[in-house]
Amino acid sequence: MQRQLMDELIAWKSRANRKPLLLKGARQTGKTWLLNEFAGQQYQNVIRFDFMLEPGARSLFDGSLDSKRIISQIELLRGQTITPTDTLIIFDEIQEAPRGITSLKYFNELAPEYHIVAAGSYMGLALRRENESFPVGKIDQLPMRPMGFVEFVRAVDGDPLADAILAADMDLLANVSEKLERLLKEYLVVGGMPEVVSAFAASHDLIEARRLQQQIIEAYESDFGKHAPARIVERMRLVWKSLPGQLAKENKKFVYGALRPGARARDFEESLQWLMDYGIVHKVPRVSALRAPLTSYEDLSGFKLFCIDTGILGALSGLSPAIVLNGPAVFTEFKGSLTEQYVAQELLLQGKTPAYWSSSSGNAETDFAIDHAGTVLPLEVKAAENLKAKSLRIACEKFKLERCVRTSLAAYRDEGTLVNIPLWEIGQIDKLA
């Protein structure tokens, strides 16, 4: 498999003002694999600590966090001399050694010549638990997410089609639209968790893919009880299990009352924040106006809550993997929730911070909106064949926007104000909008 984040890691290595790098993301997203690949391709030597498998190694950060002392300790522990430019030091599962996260600040300030990458999950939770502070401004950070559609295509179908998607060559891609639709149907069910994609690429067995997804869900749910305060664990489960139902509503706004009778926001805020810190849900806020920057218009009372991955969402919902054989049904099932989940994932992978807008009267809503080229770009997701974009036109007129995007199974079409981008190409929105 290939991950697009590899290019970011290579760029980090050659950066003159390089800082220690923190690769953060939920479990099972491929952080360890990617760092091992990066080390093997780019460095003569690698020294790796996994603080979950080697709890004794956490003593590296006992006492002084002086960088030279830590390097000397590493050399003694591993029996190797570290040459700064030739050696990559990997601190894996760094959340198990919160003072190790703090130590990155001092590596940046006192020993920037060393190439250090840390990887972990739920780090904010670990730091709060140990009363440590996050080294803001002292480290470089990269988010690790599940594989996107183009990475899935590369793993399952090979480089030529994946490269054509990245190039946004719409004339070339128009000739293989049926194949792209088939691959997208598979992606909605298989998702982008690397272990699941790898197994599917080898066997094309959807039942095995679902079995692996269930294992991942069980691992996530097991972590709830291991790391979160006992008082919120059951509430976390309620929020997590509610995702399919919340997204299957016509109005996908998250409703606390759907969790249990009489549920209120203040009862679930901590559990929701924990799930977000863990990286397995993502909040898309409502904005009161489609004006840049969107963060200035956030309405804190309204949001949609998306899952980490389309495949995981499908497994949570109990959706039969065989749905990929049933024409376009996978795109419209549960009122298009898998399709909207997919678009949210693709936007996040492109570094976007999606929001959504709905009018105060409720007569118009955009599924998403992103900051784009100094203005705002509203998006409507069309899972069905009905391509009418009334809400988009209302939004564009109300906020005097010159451009809006509809994404659907229809062919690419630029009509000036409205551009239709095929669902399988929405990851290239910057090139096409």
Tell me the role of every PLM-derived stretch.
Residues 31:
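Conserved lysine of the Walker
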Residues 34, 38:
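Hydrophobic positions on the alpha1 helix immediately C-terminal to the Walker A/P-loop
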Residues 53-85:
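Short glycine-rich substrate-engagement loop in P-loop NTPases that contacts/grips substrate
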Residues 90, 115-121, 143:
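Structural recognition of the conserved hydrophobic beta-strand(s) that form the central parallel beta-sheet
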Residues 101-117, 124:
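Conserved catalytic/switch belt of AAA+ P-loop NTPases
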